[in-house]
C-alpha cells in the first residue's frame, strides 16, 4: 500500500472534515471551523495520510506545556505554544475501509518522531478505554480518567515521556 504522509494545507479542509465526520460520532467530531482554526494555528503538527491523491487519515494536535488534555484546548488556540513541552494528539483518524493496515501507526510514529526532533518532553492524548492498549504499544502510559468530558464520553489521559538522552 503506497501511503504518503505530509503536512496539511488549507486546501485539505474539505477532505479533512469529511474524514472526521466518517470517523467520529457527531458529539465527538470536530467541525469544519475547528479544522480551519487548527490548520491555521498548528499546521506543522497536523499530518495527512494520502493514498492515490485522496486523504484517508490524519493526526493533529497543538503543542502545549500542559501534561494532559483539557476540553478548553479543542476550542482555544492560546493553548498552542510553538516551543511547548508536549505534543498533543486531538485526533487520529483513518477512514473505516483503510483501517487495520498500519495507516494510524504510520501517522503516530511520524508525529512522535517529529516531536522528538523538536526537543519536546513527550506527547499527550486522551482515548476511550478500548484504545488504551493500542496507545500503550507506542509507549504511552495510562494516567487514569481524564478531566475531559468532550462529547459526554469517559476519556483516559495517556502520556508518552521521551528519554532525556
Feature map (PLM): residue ranges:
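A short beta-loop-alpha structural element at the N-terminal edge
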Residues: 2-16
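Hydrophobic adenine-recognition pocket in adenosine-nucleotide-binding enzymes
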Residues: 8, 92-94
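Short, positively charged
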Residues: 21-30, 133
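Active-site rim helix/loop that mediates acceptor-substrate recognition in acyltransferases
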Residues: 26-56, 60-79
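Conserved acyl-donor/pantetheine-binding loop and adjacent beta-alpha core of acyl/acetyltransferases
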Residues: 58-92, 99, 109, 149-154
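Conserved catalytic-core motifs of GNAT/GCN5-like acyltransferases
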Residues: 63-66, 126, 136, 141-157
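Conserved glycine-rich acetyl-CoA-binding loop
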Residues: 81-82, 95-109, 118, 132-133, ...
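Conserved GNAT acetyl-CoA-binding A-motif
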Residues: 108, 114-127
Amino acid at each position: 500500500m503506497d501511503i504518503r504522509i505530509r503536512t496539511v494545507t488549507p486546501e485539505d479542509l474539505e477532505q479533512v472534515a469529511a474524514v472526521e465526520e466518517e470517523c467520529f460520532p457527531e458529539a465527538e467530531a470536530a467541525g469544519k471551523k475547528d479544522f480551519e482554526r487548527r490548520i491555521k494555528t498548528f499546521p506543522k503538527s497536523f499530518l495527512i495520510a494520502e493514498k492515490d491523491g485522496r486523504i484517508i487519515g490524519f493526526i493533529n494536535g497543538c503543542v502545549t506545556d500542559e501534561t494532559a488534555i483539557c476540553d478548553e484546548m479543542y476550542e482555544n488556540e492560546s493553548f498552542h505554544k510553538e516551543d511547548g513541552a508536549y505534543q498533543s494528539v486531538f485526533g487520529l483518524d483513518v477512514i473505516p475501509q483503510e483501517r487495520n493496515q498500519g495507516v494510524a501507526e504510520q501517522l503516530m510514529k511520524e508525529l512522535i518522531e517529529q516531536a522528538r526532533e523538536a526537543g519536546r518532553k513527550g506527547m499527550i492524548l486522551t482515548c476511550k478505554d478500548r484504545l488504551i492498549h493500542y496507545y500503550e504499544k507506542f509507549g504511552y502510559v495510562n494516567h487514569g480518567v481524564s478531566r475531559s468530558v468532550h462529547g459526554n464520553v469517559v476519556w483516559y489521559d495517556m502520556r508518552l515521556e521521551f528519554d532525556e538522552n
